[in-house]
């Protein structure tokens, strides 16, 4: 049987970037010790690559009650990094619930994975659960891109998602920390946060964030507020304007569409349009690095 994470990220494969041939039982045995072991909780540490930064105490309590009643049906998965020291690969919520129950030991399966494999498994395992906040999801995408030296398009293909989905999530990472924290705490939604992106001024972004929270603005109200601010920020046009030729309009629209395509690819492009008596001026800033 093909390993899900290996198939996606090509661990140990030389022929194809992301396809892993069926392993023999001997090869699997070298990689995974399938027997369940009872490991002291004090010897286990959380995964350093865990994308989830907020754990719902109430949900952990519910899980603990379920485990108390029915037992831990699915062991956690760990890897050994020192003598009698283990790092969680998958199952941190179960680990936290067992800790809350006061268990001294927890059932675990030990896998031999390197740092890159451990990080990838932890990130993808959480992404597949679809319980991450938008910021946690964005962090997971960014880490996978860095770990495997992928483009946004390549990552999207491997995860079966649209490239625009990946790009939109990653844009959230460029927002101020206060806005990212509001997303983590679920004070605002992802659509609220994305609406704030066109406001390039951080002070203005934080001001609108405060309005959203204090006035409990919905997404439509937020977008209308931001549209008004953007309109107010535009340079005042002169009363008399010369007629714009059809060719000029086509040229301007083509440039705008091209800039939007570049932005959709994940590159943070800043542009500014100015209108003068005899010409339009478009200033474009393209970062050297993503």
Swiss-Prot record:
Subcellular location: Cytoplasm, Nucleoid
SUPFAM superfamilies with a match to the protein in the record: ParB/Sulfiredoxin
Principal subcellular localisation of the protein: cytoplasm
Keywords for this protein: Cell cycle, Cell division, Cytoplasm, DNA-binding, Septation
Domain of life: Bacteria
One Gene Ontology molecular-function label: DNA binding
Pfam family, one: HTH_ParB
Residue ranges of the annotated DNA-binding region, renumbered to this chain: 153-172
Any GO CC annotation of this UniProt entry: nucleoid
GO terms of biological process kind: chromosome segregation; division septum assembly; positive regulation of sporulation resulting in formation of a cellular spore
Described function: Effects nucleoid occlusion by binding relatively nonspecifically to DNA and preventing the assembly of the division machinery in the vicinity of the nucleoid, especially under conditions that disturb the cell cycle. It helps to coordinate cell division and chromosome segregation by preventing the formation of the Z ring through the nucleoid, which would cause chromosome breakage.
Protein family per UniProt: Belongs to the ParB family.
NCBIfam families the record matches: nucleoid_noc (TIGR04285), parB_part (TIGR00180)
Protein name: Nucleoid occlusion protein
Source lineage: Bacteria, Bacillati, Bacillota, Bacilli, Bacillales
Gene that encodes the chain: noc
């Amino acid at each position: 049987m093909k390993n899900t994470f290996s198939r996606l990220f090509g661990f140990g494969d030389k022929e194809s970037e992301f396809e892993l041939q069926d392993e023999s039982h001997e090869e699997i045995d070298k990689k995974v010790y399938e027997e369940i072991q009872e490991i002291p909780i004090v010897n286990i540490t959380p995964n350093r690559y865990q994308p989830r930064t907020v754990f719902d105490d109430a949900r952990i309590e519910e899980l603990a009650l379920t485990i108390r009643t029915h037992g831990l049906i699915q062991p956690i998965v760990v890897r050994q990094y020192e003598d009698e020291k283990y790092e969680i690969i998958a199952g941190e919520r179960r680990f936290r619930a067992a800790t809350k129950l006061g268990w001294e030991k927890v059932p675990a399966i030990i896998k031999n994975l390197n740092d890159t494999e451990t990080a990838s498994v932890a990130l993808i395992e959480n992404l597949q659960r679809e319980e991450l906040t938008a910021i946690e999801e964005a962090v997971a995408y960014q880490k996978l891109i860095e770990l495997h030296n992928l483009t946004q398009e390549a990552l999207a293909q491997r995860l079966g998602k649209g490239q625009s989905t990946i790009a939109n999530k990653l844009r959230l990472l460029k927002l101020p920390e206060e806005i990212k924290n509001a997303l983590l705490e679920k004070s605002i939604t992802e659509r609220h946060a994305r609406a704030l992106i066109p406001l390039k001024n951080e002070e203005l972004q934080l001001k609108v964030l405060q309005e959203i929270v204090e006035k409990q603005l919905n997404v439509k109200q937020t977008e209308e507020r931001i549209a008004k601010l953007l309109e107010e920020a535009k340079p005042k046009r002169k009363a008399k304007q010369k007629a714009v030729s059809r060719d000029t309009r086509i040229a301007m629209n083509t440039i705008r569409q091209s800039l939007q395509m570049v932005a959709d690819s994940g590159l943070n492009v800043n542009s500014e349009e100015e209108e003068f008596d005899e010409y339009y001026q478009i200033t474009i800033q393209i970062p050297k690095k993503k």
